[in-house]
């Protein structure tokens, strides 16, 4: 399927595994160039190498934590002129709502709400 993404620049947060890695694969299949961001550098590098080899695209990586303003600043500098942002970083606490402590909820919200807002505003 041609989604007319060839040559587009895509930033994907949380790209090292799961949905983020699957999104990276899908964009690479369409010929998009990728900036892959996550906290786990080894997984990012392996994914980028595989996608570059399989799809002849540019795929750069940056280790980042969206809860840290300095990491967002650094990421935005690397992501100059992106066409598409995929906010995918992080997971949420599992379990019953009455069993999850406030610290776990705050941790998740710092990333999945404020991290997403901050990077979207910065870009």
Describe these PLM feature segments:
Residues 89-93:
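Conserved NAD(P)H cofactor-binding loop of Rossmann-fold oxidoreductase domains
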Residues 96-97, 104-109:
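Substrate-binding pocket helix/loop in short-chain dehydrogenase/reductase
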Residues 1-9:
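Flexible N-terminal pre-Rossmann segment of NAD(P)-dependent oxidoreductases
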Residues 120-121:
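A short, exposed helix-loop element centered on a Lys and neighboring polar residues
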């Amino acid at each position: 399927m041609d989604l007319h993404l060839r040559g587009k620049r895509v930033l994907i947060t949380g790209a090292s595994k799961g949905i983020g890695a699957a999104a990276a694969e899908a964009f690479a299949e369409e010929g998009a160039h990728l900036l892959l961001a996550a906290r786990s550098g080894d997984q990012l590098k392996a994914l980028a190498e595989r996608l570059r080899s399989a799809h002849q695209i540019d795929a750069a990586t940056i280790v980042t934590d969206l809860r840290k303003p300095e990491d967002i600043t650094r990421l935005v500098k690397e992501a100059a002129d992106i066409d598409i942002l995929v906010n995918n970083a992080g997971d949420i606490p599992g379990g019953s709502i009455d069993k999850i402590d406030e610290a776990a909820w705050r941790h998740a919200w710092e990333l999945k709400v404020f991290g997403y807002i901050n990077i979207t505003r910065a870009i």
